[in-house]
């Protein structure tokens, strides 16, 4: 009895559609060669990338080529040679690039060929330089630190103005408090007696 086998053309179509869907769902792609990596290493790398919203997928070059052509992404054919695995990134390409280059330090068999980030083409050197830049999370942290420092400085300046105004405001209050005392002292002092009238002149003879 002959075993039923899946239609190879259908398998091909499904594989291409799967890559197409991944391409549509991603904003960046990093092309790598995994020749020489062990299965457990690929599994470990996938796990690390998944933490950064990145899928690491081994692809057939001709299928990937069709998917990228369909998405109108050009100039990637030179990277679709040899054993190819794609890092397909939904969010922060910088974090995924950092992860790949950090992993490659301990696993030199992993080769980063190039990347497409937001429609821009990066060769191997450019994507490595990109990986060394601060990521979105780092930039947000730096921004918040600057905002907090500026706010703290503003609050201190405002408090200094308030404190200075309070010191100046105390002087008029003290002056007002002294005024009644002065008036009271003046009231206790007897008024000067009017000078005695000069004697009337004697009538002329």
UniProtKB/Swiss-Prot annotation:
Disulfide bonds: none annotated. InterPro entries: Ribosomal_uL10 (IPR001790), Ribosomal_uL10-like_sf (IPR043141), Ribosomal_uL10_bac (IPR022973), Ribosomal_uL10_bac_type (IPR047865). The keyword Signal does not apply. GO terms for biological process: translation. Keywords: Ribonucleoprotein, Ribosomal protein, RNA-binding, rRNA-binding. Residues 167-205 are annotated as: Disordered. One of its GO terms (molecular function) is large ribosomal subunit rRNA binding. It comes from the Bacteria. Residues 169-180, 190-205 have a biased composition (Low complexity). GO terms for cellular component: ribonucleoprotein complex; ribosome. Belongs to the universal ribosomal protein uL10 family. Part of the ribosomal stalk of the 50S ribosomal subunit. The N-terminus interacts with L11 and the large rRNA to form the base of the stalk. The C-terminus forms an elongated spine to which L12 dimers bind in a sequential fashion forming a multimeric L10(L12)X complex. HAMAP family: Ribosomal_uL10. Forms part of the ribosomal stalk, playing a central role in the interaction of the ribosome with GTP-bound translation factors. PANTHER family: 39S RIBOSOMAL PROTEIN L10, MITOCHONDRIAL (PTHR11560). NCBIfam families: PRK00099.1-1. This is Large ribosomal subunit protein uL10. It comes from Treponema denticola (strain ATCC 35405 / DSM 14222 / CIP 103919 / JCM 8153 / KCTC 15104).
